[in-house]
Amino acid sequence: MINLVALPCLCVDVFDGTDELYAGGEALNFAVHASKFEEFNVSILGAVGQDSYAKFIMDSISDKRIDVSHVRVEKDKVTANNRTYLTAGGDRYYKDDSWTGDIVDKMILNHDELEFIKKSDVVFVHFWAGCFGQIIDLKKNNNFRLAVDFVEYRNFKEMEKYAPYIDYFMISGEKSILPIFEAFSKKYKGLFNVSLADKGS
């Protein structure tokens, strides 16, 4: 079996006006997908508050093959959430203050969490996580495979600093950035995946 850990973003989308909830976050989505494959032992490592959003998230994955024993409950913090708005045509959009996510953005891993990650075969993290630098440092001296989601980040010079340590590099993009990642793929050993929305990857 392959031991996979996804961290640290567990959040809810909260739809304005209806307060309808959807569980998500890069780590949660990756873990749910990976749990469909029997060869993976999947764990989530992250943090939630002691609130209704946390309960909703944990209930949403209770029937999945995902170990949640490494999810911290931080009583003095709010579970990450993203207030989502809809246009008249039904398209989602966000405001500057939509995201409430200090629990993820400022998360620092403790000794036990770092030791657990070291023993994993595959580690998934997103670039904006507060613990991203810790994961890169761990990767330099450990043999796990590292997958990183850069989402819509566009500082390619900054990205390239991490390329030597990343085995699977993911980013949401457009055709215009493909030459950049083609060049990266010839220079570094990792796999570079650019998601082009309805045009595939």
Language-model features, listed with the residues they occupy:
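Active-site metal-binding loops of divalent metal-dependent hydrolases
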Residues: P8-L10, E174
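Histidine-anchored nucleotide/phosphate-binding helix
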Residues: A27-K36
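Short beta-strand/loop segments at the ligand-binding rim of alpha/beta enzyme cores
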Residues: K139-D149
